[in-house]
Amino acid sequence: MDKEDLKRQAAARALEEVRSGMKLGLGTGSTARHFVELLGEKVRGGLDVIGVPTSEVTRADAERCGIRLTTLDEIDRLDLTVDGADEVDTRLELIKGGGGALLREKIVAAASDRMIVIADESKWVDCLGKFPLPVEVIPFGLAATRRAIEKAFTQVGAAGQLKLRDGEAGHAFVTDGGHWIVDAHLGRIPDAPRLAKLLSEIPGVVEHGLFIGIASTVVLAGTEGIRTVERA
Ligand SMILES: O=C(CO)[C@H](O)[C@H](O)COP(=O)(O)O
């Protein structure tokens, strides 16, 4: 079974949690896209839901699939967000933002009663940090912001290279919010909750890819089957 099959299986399991009338956060990335496609099939079969997309790419996918969309300005809370992740640890702390949508993903997940993370089992780790940690930054004063980010890493005993994410034609990658992303190649993040707090205090940092205490459930699809882990 290839990875896309596993991602789709995880997405299908999460879909079992969706009921008519729900307001849903729609994640970004290849695994979340499977969920959007499967949800679209249900919607075409009569399921009545409304979604808030976490990126322009997901907005386009959802529209193509016939899913009704709204915004967080028009509705209050969401019942459920289903999204992928780049890494998940045993405390259900996440690294997200490989696809560059971390800011909207975090806003949407935080506005949801539940967040289900869907992933293939390769995303499950003992310690976060092998996947480069995305940090969304304001272009103004980038060098100063980078220094502050590096200081935060030192404070938690982490170290590694910070690389500005490349976009098209030699330009920096630009997020849906018009910001840049620096990816931190740390290898290991010893204290993710503390690092999350420190990064949030840096003025030039818009958001970071550490999702702490946000995911309620992780659905992991592997060759042995599907495993569901709930946050303690
Ligand atoms: O955080 C994300 C996008 O910003 C994605 O959820 C994350 O990168 C996982 O993507 P994929 O399902 O393609 O592995």
Swiss-Prot record:
This enzyme's EC code(s): 5.3.1.6
Keyword Isomerase: yes
Hydrolase listed as a keyword: no
Active site (record annotation): E105 (proton acceptor)
Name of the featured protein: Ribose-5-phosphate isomerase A
Known role: Catalyzes the reversible conversion of ribose-5-phosphate to ribulose 5-phosphate.
Domain of life: Bacteria
GO biological process, one term: pentose-phosphate shunt, non-oxidative branch
Pathway: Carbohydrate degradation; pentose phosphate pathway; D-ribose 5-phosphate from D-ribulose 5-phosphate (non-oxidative stage): step 1/1
Catalytic reaction annotation: aldehydo-D-ribose 5-phosphate = D-ribulose 5-phosphate
PANTHER family: RIBOSE-5-PHOSPHATE ISOMERASE 3, CHLOROPLASTIC-RELATED
Residues binding substrate: T28, G29, S30, T31, D83, G84, A85, D86, K96, G97, G98, G99, K123
Entry GO MF terms: ribose-5-phosphate isomerase activity
Top enzyme class: isomerase
InterPro entries: NagB/RpiA_transferase-like (IPR037171), Ribose-5P_isomerase (IPR050262), Ribose5P_isomerase_typA_subgr (IPR020672), Ribose5P_isomerase_type_A (IPR004788)
The organism of origin for this protein: Rhodopseudomonas palustris (strain BisB5)
Family: Belongs to the ribose 5-phosphate isomerase family.
CDD domains membership: RPI_A (cd01398)
Keyword entries, A-Z: Isomerase
Subunit description: Homodimer.
